């Protein structure tokens, strides 16, 4: 898409908030104001869309709505409350050689907020592109009911070699998981099998060698009643604030770890370092979705932790490595304590990552557990 055409679409989107609504459903109706959903149902009463993509998309054609969805890279489930801010325009020019170093600017950033129907959980998310030439992070949020059980699912996906794998996970991972026949009875088994099957499905969907290097990490939180499951592949990370302390709930999959290196080498791969340890001198994570040429030893098998949600659990952060590259777990939870609600916390985390000159895309979701207190989803 040529730059002048892209700018034209954005200008039209900004100017069209009072136009008549398009007669055709956009590709992401769940980002719009309450109304008919793609599956034929109606948006629940607690679903709301305030401003941003929801308001600006009124009167847009399919291509403009698709543009908003692509820029934000956000998937919100049919039964989740969310609002999102539209993509920000590029700000600032190229930094001169002798100019003062400035934090990287983000061409496309988005943020949003939501809460569960029972009021026990609220969440906020924030993301920005940073210095990378493209945005390869994606996230997915879904709040639904399975056999009468309230289920909330959250995922952050960090693409590499292109956005295709992360986009596929955003669309399919949780859809596949809730359909697993043992999702409620043996959730850990269901998560493990769904991750592996979704990886196989993605590889089958990319027939062209053009996408053979597309891959993605993933970190997901699945809440079923008072049981919390955290699953991760790669180096996107989950960190909880519990009883005032940082508690890691995921394990970074790095090729220099003794067990991971042995597994890779036993399968025929090599691990080498050029300041960063890499599989076959290419990939800086030892597990990932996609990466077809390395699939023998770069698996999508997740580490899974199961926890009981008790009153000590206050917050949970899911974030891509663009955040963790410049922030310790303890720094992240300290920032959470000073913020007013999960959206403010998510935005603060990404702002600090940008101020610390992270070189990568950054996306994070912050969950706040209320334990009978009034919900604050700011």
UniProtKB/Swiss-Prot annotation:
Domain (PPM-type phosphatase) ranges: 122-369
GO biological process: signal transduction
Names of the cofactor(s): Mg(2+); Mn(2+)
An example molecular function term from Gene Ontology annotations: protein serine/threonine phosphatase activity
EC number: 3.1.3.16
Keyword Mitochondrion: no
Family annotation (Pfam families): PP2C
Binding site for Mn(2+) 2: 158, 321, 360
Binding, Mn(2+) 1: 158-159
InterPro entries referenced in this protein's UniProt entry, alphabetically: PP2C, PP2C_BS, PPM-type-like_dom_sf, PPM-type_phosphatase-like_dom
Region (Disordered): 1-59, 79-115
Catalytic function, reaction form: O-phospho-L-seryl-[protein] + H2O = L-seryl-[protein] + phosphate; O-phospho-L-threonyl-[protein] + H2O = L-threonyl-[protein] + phosphate
Residue ranges with Basic residues bias: 92-104
Highest taxon, organism lineage: Eukaryota
Record's cofactor remark: Binds 2 magnesium or manganese ions per subunit.
Biased composition (Low complexity): 7-26
UniProt keywords, alphabetically: Hydrolase, Magnesium, Manganese, Metal-binding, Protein phosphatase
Family assignment from sequence similarity: Belongs to the PP2C family.
Listed name of the protein: Probable protein phosphatase 2C 55
Upper classification of the organism: Eukaryota, Viridiplantae, Streptophyta, Embryophyta, Tracheophyta
